[in-house]
């Protein structure tokens, strides 16, 4: 009888130990797994940068920042997208997430960590724009024959002063005015409704011309004014 009781006690202790291990693993998962290799960076940097290609063929640039270090990964399989990592001066990960390089805005979910590498919060920057995501904007621009990687192409998004998620896009129309100005097509999209609310043409000199005035913008339509 004593042997049976001892056996059950051992099983119970083993079970508790297993649960403790699972809890430890679960808690460990909220810690940042990535660290900045300061020693490798200092040994390989040139002009303050260390540039290399990772195992997936992505170009990686590591730099020093005002408060630590940065790692920027140009994702070859995603259009104009970089994955950014910012690290504390200790090399512990501070924040990570993607940016759309064509507009400099954050996309997808970003994770933020404290100085111990513990996850403190996550923010989904795509959520306000989920009804009209970046993919739809790019598809629309293609339908308008816009150069997605053109010198003057701009794609930007923000929440406006009324709390409406808005897209702002522009590109070179490849039409010169009689004054020889470049013509830009400008579009504003309400991401909640998926509706173009404004289109206008603006103009500028490719090179500064102090002698002639730039033509005034031409409004094609504007639904923002009632």
Kindly label every feature range from the protein language model.
Residues 4-13:
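Sec-dependent N-terminal signal peptides
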Residues 16-226:
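Glycine/tyrosine- and acidic-biased, solvent-exposed loop/turn segments at the edges of beta-strands
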């Amino acid at each position: 009888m004593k042997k049976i009781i001892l056996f059950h006690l051992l099983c119970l202790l083993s079970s508790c130990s297993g649960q403790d291990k699972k809890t430890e693993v679960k808690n460990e998962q909220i810690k940042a797994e990535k660290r900045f290799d300061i020693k490798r960076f200092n040994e390989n940097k040139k002009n303050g940068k260390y540039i290399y290609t990772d195992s997936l063929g992505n170009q990686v640039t590591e730099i020093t920042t005002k408060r630590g270090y940065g790692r920027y990964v140009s994702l070859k399989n995603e259009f104009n997208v970089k994955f950014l990592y910012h690290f504390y001066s200790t090399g512990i990960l501070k924040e990570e997430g993607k940016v759309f390089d064509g507009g400099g805005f954050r996309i997808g979910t970003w994770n933020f960590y404290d100085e111990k590498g513990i996850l403190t919060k996550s923010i989904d920057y795509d959520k306000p724009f989920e009804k009209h995501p970046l993919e739809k904007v790019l598809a629309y621009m293609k339908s308008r024959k816009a150069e997605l990687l053109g010198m003057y192409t701009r794609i930007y998004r923000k929440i406006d002063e009324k709390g409406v998620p808005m897209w702002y896009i522009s590109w070179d129309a490849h039409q010169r005015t009689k004054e020889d100005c470049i013509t830009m097509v400008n579009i504003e999209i309400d991401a909640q409704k998926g509706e173009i609310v404004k289109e206008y043409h603006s103009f500028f000199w490719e090179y500064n011309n102090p002698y002639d005035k730039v033509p005034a913008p031409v409004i094609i339509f504007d639904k923002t004014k009632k």
